[in-house]
């Protein structure tokens, strides 16, 4: 196992409900990647954009070779096949690790799942299957999963998928909330790449913003 290597998998919602947040999503993602390029250690990045279908724009690319995402890749459309995106990504990464040489298997694997709506279009995977897959990878290999959700109960949704409450957070699906997500996720990635356990308060800035502005909107 390569203790200096981290596997990072981003699953980003680009369904029609993300309309208007394209530039914030692209800008936040690119800023996070640039920051991570300067962090110590090696990292492989996979990025899956999902709507009705999943599109892989990075497949285990060295983080230092990632080019900025543009609106050619991130263009919103369609519905939300969230379960298919998660299930397909776990299956792919799991197979790669299974057949890799021991010294090539990353010591740390992190999935970051961001969505602003309910699952409504998956055909290959259901929540029971995805939950089984996530729980297997967590218990056997120590994979981490972060779930960031807007316009849904993110904590309850994550539970259905086998992701614990302390790894799920609600956020505001707007410019401020979207950019804050990437800042906070970047800090969590830095911690994981250093070999430190995921902090219990990794999501505190997002929670604070959500609660403060939820009160204002209510």
Residue spans of the language-model regions?
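Acidic, low-complexity intrinsically disordered regions
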Residues: 1-218
């Amino acid at each position: 196992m390569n203790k200096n290597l981290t596997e990072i998998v981003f699953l980003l919602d680009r369904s029609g409900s993300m309309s208007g947040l394209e530039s914030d999503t692209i800008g936040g993602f690119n800023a996070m990647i640039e920051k991570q390029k300067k962090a110590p250690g090696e990292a492989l990045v996979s990025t899956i954009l999902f709507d009705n279908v999943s599109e892989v724009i990075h497949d285990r690319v060295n983080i230092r070779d990632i080019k900025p995402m543009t609106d050619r890749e991130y263009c919103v459309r369609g519905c939300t096949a969230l379960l298919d995106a998660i299930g397909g990504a776990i299956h792919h990464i799991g197979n790669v690790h299974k057949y890799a040489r021991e010294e090539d298997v990353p010591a740390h694997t992190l999935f970051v799942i961001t969505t602003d709506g309910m699952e409504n279009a998956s055909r290959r995977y259901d929540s029971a299957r995805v939950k089984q897959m996530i729980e297997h990878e967590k218990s056997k290999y120590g994979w981490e999963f972060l779930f960031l959700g807007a316009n849904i109960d993110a904590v309850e949704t994550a539970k259905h998928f086998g992701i614990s409450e302390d790894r799920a957070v609600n956020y505001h699906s707007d410019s401020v909330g979207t950019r804050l997500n990437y800042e906070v996720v970047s800090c969590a990635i830095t911690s994981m790449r250093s070999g430190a356990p995921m902090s219990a308060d990794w999501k505190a800035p997002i929670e604070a913003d959500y609660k403060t502005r939820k009160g204002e909107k209510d």
